[in-house]
Structure formats: structure tokens, C-alpha cells
Amino acid sequence: MKNEKITSRSEDFASWYTDVVKAAHLAEYSNVKGFIIFEPNGYAIWEKIQSVMDGMFKELGHQNVYLPVMIPENLLKKEGELVEGFAPEVAWVTSGGSNSLEERLAFRPTSESLFSDYYKNVVKTYRDLPKLYNQWCNVIRWEKETRPFLRSREFLWQEGHTVHATSEEAEEETLRMLNTYKRFFEEYLAIPVVVGKKTEKEKFAGAEYTLTVEALMQNGICLQSATSHYFGQKFAKAYDVKFVNKDNKFEYCYQTSWGSTTRMIGALIMVHGDDKGLVLPPKIAPKQVCIVPIKMTDELLNVCNNLNDELHKNNITSYIDTSDKSAGFKFAEAEVNGIPVRIEVGPRDLENNKVTLVRRDTSEKELVNTNEVLNNVQRLLTDIQDSLYNKALENTKNRTYDAKTLKDVEEIMNTRPGFVNAHWCGDLDCELKMKEIKGTKSRCIVETKDYKDEVCVVCGKKAKHKVVWGIQY
């Protein structure tokens, strides 16, 4: 049954998204435009994401640090491409208390300048390398158009910054982190992704190249979900980050950075959500099971407590809804919040030592013996995780197209948008021409080679790259 507080996806996808954010108590608007309040349900998802990703990073040898939120203007401006790329989005502090500052301070839009300046002071010889650091923090970028989780003026993220003795090692790190993100999205968020290299126009300001993770939402709109950048020696030369190598000579370091944000929560909503609300993959759900006593009797509560204890002992996150609301309200609340499995404990079923299990993704119900709840819940959680991924993969496959001409691209984007595979000559003019079709942009280059017969989708000249194109959030 459709949740009356939520606009249907078919009616208005954008309104549906906003309704789910509110109905599931993920976030609220603040009194400053573009800034949101993370409510407990939303922040709990971010905490779960943090926990899993942090463990993955540490397995690879990364350590967490924290650098200041303020960046002196002169420091930010040292790398010209970086400041040029972020200048329109930087928020500045010009006074402290009642005193004007001698130099403006930028709220960090990203921290390459701070990390480079830090590495300049702590890296002396090749023995100090590599440094593999990550920080969890907030960032401020003065976006023109904002939407909760997808584009906010303040967002939470992790940004990894590493420094190496060789280009080979730094490039290996860039690729390693891209693959780490891909694994996280597919294994934990149950979101299939496409990975590749950004074009020169779309790469991170100051990077030699950018690798990207791209996901497709239910409505065929693309979401850049994580990026990994190789800087070469650009930042090292700008910030004088040098080390004494094994030949006892000074050499500039090689750097990378990589990041992902609370935008992932938006991806979860738009990839898995339905007209009832949020649908969370079990591996990332803060609460995997909701236990609902149909009546608040001692007998039913005793069974609920026993089930809750058994699930907890087996590392399944569950809770009992003991609120004074009706059972129907509790069911609907668990649904809108995306709890993967619901256990309904009622007096009639209990007479036969049975309870009802309900899976969130399909609403299918099954009656099981009370002594078989654990095994069945474990089975359901695994199956839901796999089913959500496969459903999202099916949507991605059904919305992935091949295009040979601009007319093909226009027809796709105007009817049923998605990922469009099309060859490209590499010229900026052709990339800009694609943008005239409903804002279509290159998502990533997935192949570069000496093509014999393939031609550019725009100009018809010999192609250099195979590119995935799409309309983005």
C-alpha cells in the first residue's frame, strides 16, 4: 500500500525524493539555505557508512587525521587550477569577533592545500614515505542549487590524501582506492556502478587525471558517487613538498586524493526506495530488524525480548517497538524507515509457537516457528541484500544504451534517459555540443584505443575514446 505522505515516483520523482527524506526522518531544512539538519535516522546511516569504510581504509594501511577547517587565502591560491576551479564556491571569513582579519580565511571546500602544506613540514626523506592519511570532516561549498544529501552547501565526507616517492606507487594508490569505492558500493550499498576516467573538462581541478564511480538512479539520472585523483607532482611543486631520495637528491613527491560524501545517502534513497519510503540494504542498515508486538502483553513482550536477545548475540541489529502506537502504525513506520525485516509477534500465531516475518523489499510474509527465527532472519537478510543489488543492476542494464548519432542521444535523453555508450573524438567542442541535449555530460571514459571504424557521435571524425554519457544530479 502506498504511503499517503509520499508522492509516487511515477507522478513526480523529485517530490518523491523530498517526501522520503522527510517521512523517514533523514533530514530537515535549516534556517540557512542549503544547509540541512541530519536527523537521527539519517546520521545513523552515515555512521554505518563511516564504520564500514573506515575499516576498509585501515585494512589498506590508512590512518585518520584531522586538519583545520580554515585555509589562509594565500595558501589556497598557491595551486592555480585548484583555486580557479573552486573560486565560485568558496565561503570566506573576513572578521574574527569585531576585528577585521588581515587575510581572508576560506572554509575548506577541499583540503589539498592544507595537506600539501602539512606534508611539506613532515616529509624529509624517502624513509618518511608513503604517508597514507584520511580525514572525516565537513566541507562548505556555496552551491547555487541545493537538494538534501545530493547538493548541500555543507556536507560530510571523507577525503584521503596520500604522498609517495614514485609516480608508479601514487598511480597504484589512485586505482586501488577507485576499486575500494567500487567494492563498497556494490557489496554494501547494493548499488552497481560504472568506473572510468573523467575527461579533461570534467576532471578535478589541479589533477593530472580523475577516476570516478558513477551510479544510475531509478529515473535514469546519473550520480557521481566517489572520485580518486592522481596529482603527479603538481601540488608538490606548488607547495614545495620535497624529499631526499635514495640517491641523496631532492625530489618532488607524488600525491593523490580521493573522496566520498553523504551524497551516498541520496543514492541509497534513489536506487532502492519505493512509494512506501526508504529501502535499506541489510549490510548498511543501522537497524536490520524491527520486532513488533501486536499487543503489549507480558507474554508477547517476553517472546519479543527473547528474540531480540538471540538476534543481538548473532550480530544482527534489532529493536522492539514498544511505543503506544497501533500495530498498523508501527508496521508503516518500519516500512518508511526502510528496516529490512519486520517480525510480527501476535497472540494467535504464538499459540502455535509461530511469528510472522515480513521483508521490506517485496512485502512478502512468511510464518515461522519461534525456534527458527534466527536462521530465517539470516537467510532473509542475505537474500534481500542480493535481491536489491540484482534489481538495481537490472534497472542499470535496462537503461544503458548504445548511440551512434546525436539524434540517437537526443531520442534517448528525451524519452527514457540513462547511461549512453557513445564514441568521442576527444575534442572539447563535441563534448560541449553533447551538453546542449538536456545537459548531457561525459560521465567517464571507459575505453581509449586506436579505433578502425568507430567515429565520434557528434562530428563523425575518427573516435579516440568510448565514453559513458548521461544527465547528472
Question: What annotation goes with each model-predicted range?
Answer:
Residues 1-473:
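NTP/phosphate- and nucleic-acid-binding module
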